[in-house]
Regions:
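Glycine-rich anion/phosphate-binding loops
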Residues: 408-420, 469-479, 529-542
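Composition-driven, intrinsically disordered low-complexity tracts enriched in small residues
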Residues: 1-236, 240, 250, 313-349, ...
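Extracellular acidic loop/turn motifs
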Residues: 258-266
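Short coil/turn motif common to extracellular beta-sandwich-like domains
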Residues: 246-252
Length: 868
């Protein structure tokens, strides 16, 4: 999504409001939506806050409830080498222990299990470890005067979740639609109501901090005048950071924050340190920074940003410009934050230290990846014309309008080159795992609706599988068996994606759906909008588990279930890439997501039912999960409440919606972020053996102050794209920072298995960068793998790392211009020649081939920023 490349903040709001009005008045959404951001933009990302007065900056206030870290001196002298002082936090927003489910819900009777629970972050330091929120803002609040955290995410988890007592309700999207693609008559009401509630909240926000404190001295004319001056011409805090010397692998210091009026201050960490470290800030502005192990081993530099605010002191105004805070929404465009806060970036330099743990588990899964539609096509490869994406990229209208930029026939031809590719992956790259996908439309080019599974209580029987076998294209079934055989012959473990976006055209006819659904008419083959698609997907998943269970143990059922809600249902030309069916119908996104979740859960159960053969000794017969694309959003301006709210809302929805649904059983069907009893579904919970994390970069957000698009209550701003010429920007115009990977890994690690305590295992199923010159990729690979190593060294259960991609391929609507591969490909040569990218291959293979299963110091010295 490249929205901010084309439109600025105000222009973006105008575009969004225009889309919203159009949708509401005839192209609308039936879902109720609500602005659930906090009472104040300043607090909206705060999991907790650290509050102090500048007059007591060196001592902890009496009666404080904080459990922040010890003083810098004691921390530096007592913490052991590489001790975890902060793991970056487990949440993307302001969840706390009080927000956790009160009891552990149970699994449905079919497979009784205790309910999985999400671990909330804590501010308590235990054995020198403290979690810091990894959302757009993170802080610790101990002042009784401080505002209560009431962000979008805080409210989503404020109600106790108890699936064991939740009534079993039918999982549907609430609406008055007569058919799935119809317009809902309540659209105008919900749209206008949502805008009004956003404006009302914005009006009340400045008063959320409470009344100002009265004069401290006996009341006289002079003290009254001084008090008036203090409240109307309040000074903004200033910062003068002081950094102490490094000790035991830790860097301590103080932000040196002073409030000219003696107001208590709150300290809020924005995201995580850029280059992969962790930081904690206490109530006095003392910070403790820990570098990732790789940086500690060779030295380097990192930076983090902290927002210092005096807003918790109560209502006050920072001079004439400060009055802008009383202008709803627009005030933060004129004077962001009203002068209450200042953002301070601290740069830390790390001296190298010997004896640092740089190891990986000996059985760690090192892999590369590609996907069927993106890579199979090319000279000599049989064409598959039966998928929605094939129809989409060949559609004359799309080609004429420039909505698509490539066809699979010009691809790298992995369909025919699979054996030599497997050899390169193992021998040249040092991999032991290969991730790839099966194309549903190749296995079943025609409908499987004739196979009725309703007579088995909704499950797939052996007779059903045999009937499906009769409908399958046996040549293609054998082809994938041959591919898996080749992978194993090259000592590569298959990691197989059951569905990587594409659908058979009998499930989804994109061009017909585009016309009918945009007009609100019934569309029969509407993909995940159709109510029968989850059942058809269930059959397909059961079939591939039955057919390939003896060759495959590790299954990724769905690839990135959330991103298509933007590219498919807010496909504004030149603003958002157009994916089939290319609608501007954001109101349909919830139907899409709910049906995906239904299909995933049914597939999960079927794959465990039909894959009972262990293909690799020591592994479970079926290790089943999903691949979650995760983008940590940060406020473009950390002191602007609009930006903070936009980042919070994005993080709570984009990174958490799907795991909340299939791990916790909370299916937020109207996407409003507010948990209600009818959204709790025990039958959906605990359907995961691992979570795939897919991370490419972070995302600064410019906020609107409202959610202007009906159906998208979580979209309160637009992302800021970077220039590809910047050293930390990809060719996809996305900022790249290793700290963002830590952020999303901590989110993923906060989810628990059915026992409520064991972390859901993580598999990094995609990580990569579009880099045509291969100049940024080597450093990107090394630094992101270094974050993975650091997380493992400090206790996180991560099973593997997969680089995307093995070879340059068709990047969906963007065509072939974005080059992610470790190899290029020349489709004009008969052998589809693979062109190696030496610097990147050298960097990654030096790690994967290391005989000690460790990060080589020589490679770290080349690529860690500022290495000595």
């Amino acid at each position: 999504m490249r929205s901010s490349v084309y439109v600025g903040r105000v222009g973006g709001l105008a575009v969004a409001l225009g889309v919203g009005v159009a949708v509401a008045t005839g192209y609308g959404c039936g879902q109720a939506w609500a602005d659930t951001s906090g009472a104040s933009g300043e607090s909206s990302s705060e999991s907790a806050s650290t509050t102090t007065s500048d007059s007591t900056a060196a001592e902890q206030p009496k009666g404080s409830e904080t459990t922040a870290s010890p003083s810098p001196e004691s921390t530096a002298s007592e913490a052991p080498t590489s001790v975890v002082v902060s793991t970056g936090g487990a949440n993307t927003s302001s969840e706390s222990k009080d927000d956790e489910p009160a009891t552990k819900p149970t699994k449905p009777a079919k497979k009784p299990k205790p309910k999985a629970k999400v671990s909330a972050p804590t501010t308590k330091v235990d054995d020198a470890e403290a979690k810091v929120d990894t959302g757009s803002r993170a802080a610790v609040d101990t002042s009784e005067q401080a505002k209560p955290a009431s962000s979008f995410a805080a409210q989503t988890m404020s109600a106790a979740t108890d699936l064991s007592t939740a009534a079993v309700t039918t999982l549907n999207v609430p609406s008055l639609r007569p058919w799935p693609t119809a317009y809902d008559p309540t659209t105008v009401v919900t749209y206008v109501g949502g805008l009004v509630s956003s404006v009302v909240k914005a009006v009340l926000d400045p008063f959320a901090a409470g009344a100002p404190a009265g004069p401290a001295q006996p009341l006289t004319v002079w003290t009254l005048l001084a008090w008036v001056r203090r409240e109307l011409f309040n000074g903004t805090p200033t910062t003068h950071p002081v950094i102490n010397s490094q000790s035991n692998g830790l860097v301590t210091g103080n932000l040196g924050a002073v409030d000219p009026d003696g107001d208590p201050l709150t300290y809020t960490v924005v995201g995580t340190p850029h280059n992969g470290g962790t930081v904690e800030v206490d109530q006095n502005g003392n910070f403790t920074y820990r570098p990732m192990n790789a940086m500690l081993a060779v030295g380097g530099t990192d930076q983090f940003t902290v927002v210092v605010s005096d807003e918790s002191a109560g209502l006050h105004v920072h001079g004439p410009l400060g009055l802008a805070k009383f202008v709803p929404i627009l005030g933060n465009f004129l004077n962001p934050g009203g002068g209450d806060a200042v953002a301070q970036t601290v740069v830390v330099n790390i001296d190298p230290q010997a004896g640092v743990d740089l190891s990986f588990p000996a059985n760690f899964h090192w892999g590369v990846a590609h996907a069927g539609f993106q890579a199979e096509g090319g000279p000599g490869s049989p064409i598959d014309p039966n998928s929605d994406w094939y129809k989409w990229v060949h559609d004359p209208i799309n080609q004429l309008l420039g909505l698509t930029h490539g066809v699979p026939e010009n691809g790298p031809g992995t369909y025919v080159q699979y054996d030599s590719d497997a050899g390169l992956a193992h021998d040249a790259l040092g991999m032991n795992t290969f991730r790839m996908s099966i194309e549903w439309s190749r296995i079943f080019p025609n409908s499987t609706a004739s196979v009725d599974v309703s007579d088995e209580g909704g499950g797939v029987s052996l007779a059903d599988l045999q009937a499906l076998d009769a409908l399958a294209n046996q040549d293609e079934v054998q082809h994938y068996r041959d591919v898996f055989t080749s992978l194993r012959a090259h000592d590569l473990e298959p990691l197989i994606t059951v569905n990587h976006f594409t659908l058979p055209s009998w499930v989804h006819d994109p061009t017909t759906t585009r016309l009918l659904a945009q007009l609100g008419l019934p569309a029969q083959d509407a993909g995940w909008l159709s109510s029968d698609t989850p059942v058809e997907f269930q059959k397909y998943a059961a079939y591939v588990a039955w057919k390939y269970g003896d060759q495959v143990d590790n299954w990724t059922v769905l690839n990135e279930p959330v991103p298509p809600v933007l590219t498919e249902f807010l496909a504004i030309p030149t603003v958002v890439p157009s994916w089939p069916p290319g609608l501007i119908r954001p109101d349909l996104a919830s139907t899409f997501l709910v049906n995906e979740a239904k299909g995933y859960v049914a597939a999960y159960d079927e794959m465990h039912k039909w894959d009972t053969t262990v293909a690799t000794a020591g592994q479970p017969a079926a290790f089943v999960g999903f691949a979650n694309n995760m983008i940590p959003a940060r406020p473009a301006n950390p002191v602007n409440p609009n930006d903070v709210q936009a980042a919070d809302a994005w993080n709570a929805f984009y990174n958490r919606w799907f795991p909340n649904a299939v791990i916790n059983g909370w299916v937020d069907a109207n996407l409003d972020g507010i948990q209600t009893p009818d959204e709790l579904h025990p039958e959906m919970a605990n359907k995961v053996d691992f979570m795939g994390v897919q991370y490419y970069g972070s995302q600064p957000m410019q906020g609107f102050g409202v959610a202007p698009i009906p159906g998208f209550p979580w979209l309160k701003g637009l992302p800021v794209r970077c220039a590809a010429s910047d050293p930390t920007c990809s060719d996809f115009n996305q900022p790249t920072d290793p700290g963002g990977l830590r952020e999303v890994l901590d989110i993923a690690a906060s989810y628990k298995l059915a026992d409520g305590t064991t972390q859901v295992p993580i598999w990094i199923t995609e990580n990569g960068i579009a880099d045509a010159n291969d100049s940024k990729r080597p450093s990107y690979i090394v630094n992101h793998i270094a974050v993975v190593q650091d997380e493992i060294a400090h206790g996180m259960d991560i099973r593997g790392y997969t680089y995307w991609s093995f070879v340059d391929n068709l990047e969906w609507a963007n065509g072939y211009d974005l080059e992610f591969g470790l190899y290029g490909s020349d489709p004009t040569t008969p052998e589809l020649e693979r062109t190696p990218k030496p610097a990147s291959i050298s960097a990654i293979s030096s790690i994967t081939k290391d005989v000690n299963h460790s990060l080589p110091l020589s490679v770290l010295a080349m690529y860690i920023p500022g290495a000595v």
